[in-house]
Amino acid sequence: MAKLIIINSEKGEKVETHEDIFKLSNLQQREIYAITNERTKSILLNQTFYTILDIENEPKDKVAFDSYNSLFPTSIFSYSRQDRLFGTCNHVLDNNIHYSFALFDSMVDNLSTYLPNDWNIIKISDSIDYPIGNDLLFYVFDNLVHMTIDQFVNSEEKQMNTVPKCKESQDKIKEVFTDIMSHLYMPAIDYDPQSYNYRVSRREIGNLVRDQVFSLVKGHIHLIGPEMESLRNIIMFLHAGNSITFHTIDTSTKSSYIKELEFNKKTKLTMASVLVNQRKNMNNFFKGLIRHYITYGIPRKVYYIGAYPSYWLELITWVPFNIVAYDPKYRRVDNDKIIWYDRLFDRNDIETIESKSYIYIDIRTDVRNLDTTKKQRIFKEEDDMIVDMAIKLASKQCTVMFKRKIFPGNNMSFGDPLFHPKLTQLGREYYNCITTIVSPSVYKESELYSLLLSARSNNVSNYVYGGSKFDQFSIVNCNSTVVALYSLSNTVNSLKTIEHAIKYNHIITFPHRTDRGDWRNIEELDNSSPFQNRKRQLEFEDWSIDPKNYVMKFRCEMVSESVFLQLGHSRALIPDLYNHMISLRMEMPLFYSDRFFSHIGIRQPSIFKRDSYMTSRLSAYISRQLTHSINLSVLKRNHFEGYSGHLIAIETSFSSLVFTMSPYRWLIRAKKLLTKNKMRDKFKIGDGQPHTREEFENTYDYLKINRLVNSTFRSLLLD
């Protein structure tokens, strides 16, 4: 269970030793005030997965605590020691809708017409309150706009990179606004995967987990089902000299021009459709860049020719390189990685480009007021110029991703013609990507249109990343790691495919079989299947897992997402049962130490159950002793030893303990200590001494006689 620890010398639990931290971890409450010293503060920060607010010594923590008090209780996402994001927003108390999504910047004036008159849209990029406008503005627009996709494609608003103004009455606007605000601020009283509370928690902890995973793995990975949320992590991973085999699924289906045109005319416009064009250029840019990493490694330099307006450039402030942009139309970009030259890039500039650079070309001549004949002539001249540039650049061992046009008759494509999915406009564009000089292939106009129409049904991940579907026959290098975050668990994948991935070094996520009740009170199953019920979450259906049966079968580590984050500096304080499980099979640092995934909170399930029914601890000791003798005086003489309460917790509450520790790691450490009981650990938490083999055997006798578990890890621990 994730906890919020508030360090405050005026009140709280005294935490002066590592044993005090162990005791604190077994307290039942989520929010705890603590009085620490420097050593115990360091242990809490580094050796637990708790969110720590030092309100006396850290000004940012004091600000965060004040905000937390005004929002209490709320989820907290810590991206570093002091950079935090809360799960809700109080800017609404001033009638302000707060957003951070840069693609809204050019639309704010028109988007404001979709809100009640007394409400404002404000952009705050680094607020600790959650930017609910990123979601709310999608909803109000989608529910109030009356334009079709086809009407928008031919509108002035599209050319201006904005949205049409709202034409609904204030009464209707208020009705829709009330609906979405009621949804966003609906108090969560039960597990509800359709709630905003759940959506925010899953989105943000997913981002933290992706960051942690990609900082953990090195070398070559097989990446299964990556979504666009992983784009930043993928680029940073490749830029660090690593490599990836992508596994995605092509969902393209054949279609016809009439069918797609009819779809545009009948389908109501949505915000997602509005943003397609900006996202198209961004996705094309990164598709070509990934191709460069695969072919040449880290690019010497990165160029963007024909950059105006490219509002998406504000979304990628994280890129680990500068982007040299050329376009005579200048726009000030709020991204210090962009170096903009407000002039044309011409053939003479090619000589200045270093080899093994990456160039994205998206030159567009303004032809809006020209007749058809002139347009066609300009399109042909522009296409010839772009192709000439691309070939000359490719001859220098550069990767070039460049825009092309479809012309009547035969067309010369350099490599495969590339078509972005989900495009709203049935235009005449496609892209080529080359890394060296290649001979062109001939395509008829009709063939290119057929590919364009089919691509509309493909998914963006497959387009950007490429790769093939992962299945039970996929070949995985023994030195590679399989990474499957929120993907492989989908029920479109067979259990044979999933088990094939689990065999290798891996990091794979699954939902837990339990989503209601209290994490400390999860009953053991009477079957041995690792995979349980299919679970619907948001728009997906996943295989859920039972952690104990899973670990017994596959012999790999399993922890919740919150516990997993302890490997780095990020933390997540969310409802416990919102956590997904993370399956791990890989070499880990300090595996036999309390540095990571230690047994904090191991007593919580037993304390929770005992306290719920006012059961004395003495009852537990007597119950164990009666397994072997009715002489209860032995308990005092042995100081209540002779059995392992921790092992009882592991065996009876394994599927609960994954929310606070790694029970599998505890077993492996305990086995190690049976043969080497004087292992020194400077990270030790708790004063307990290693158990003997006899104590473990006594414990298993107790579990068996009292029929407390259906299956055990006895062979793993004692054989």
From Swiss-Prot:
<keyword id="KW-0946">Virion</keyword>
<keyword id="KW-0694">RNA-binding</keyword>
<dbReference type="Pfam" id="PF06929">
    <property type="entry name" value="Rotavirus_VP3"/>
</dbReference>
<keyword id="KW-0507">mRNA processing</keyword>
<dbReference type="InterPro" id="IPR011181">
    <property type="entry name" value="VP3_Rotav"/>
</dbReference>
<keyword id="KW-0342">GTP-binding</keyword>
<dbReference type="GO" id="GO:0005525">
    <property type="term" value="F:GTP binding"/>
</dbReference>
<keyword id="KW-0511">Multifunctional enzyme</keyword>
<comment type="similarity">
    <text>Belongs to the rotavirus VP3 family.</text>
</comment>
<keyword id="KW-0547">Nucleotide-binding</keyword>
<dbReference type="GO" id="GO:0003723">
    <property type="term" value="F:RNA binding"/>
</dbReference>
<protein>
    <recommendedName>
        <fullName>Protein VP3</fullName>
        <ecNumber>2.7.7.50</ecNumber>
        <ecNumber>2.1.1.56</ecNumber>
    </recommendedName>
</protein>
<dbReference type="GO" id="GO:0016032">
    <property type="term" value="P:viral process"/>
</dbReference>
<dbReference type="GO" id="GO:0004484">
    <property type="term" value="F:mRNA guanylyltransferase activity"/>
</dbReference>
<comment type="subunit">
    <text>Interacts with VP1. Interacts with VP2.</text>
</comment>
<dbReference type="GO" id="GO:0004482">
    <property type="term" value="F:mRNA 5'-cap (guanine-N7-)-methyltransferase activity"/>
</dbReference>
<keyword id="KW-0808">Transferase</keyword>
<keyword id="KW-0949">S-adenosyl-L-methionine</keyword>
<keyword id="KW-0548">Nucleotidyltransferase</keyword>
<keyword id="KW-0489">Methyltransferase</keyword>
<comment type="function">
    <text>Multifunctional enzyme involved in mRNA capping. Catalyzes the formation of the 5' cap structure on the viral plus-strand transcripts. Specifically binds to GTP and displays guanylyltransferase and methyltransferase activities. Together with VP1 polymerase, forms an enzyme complex positioned near the channels situated at each of the five-fold vertices of the core. Following infection, the outermost layer of the virus is lost, leaving a double-layered particle (DLP) made up of the core and VP6 shell.</text>
</comment>
<keyword id="KW-0506">mRNA capping</keyword>
<dbReference type="GO" id="GO:0019013">
    <property type="term" value="C:viral nucleocapsid"/>
</dbReference>
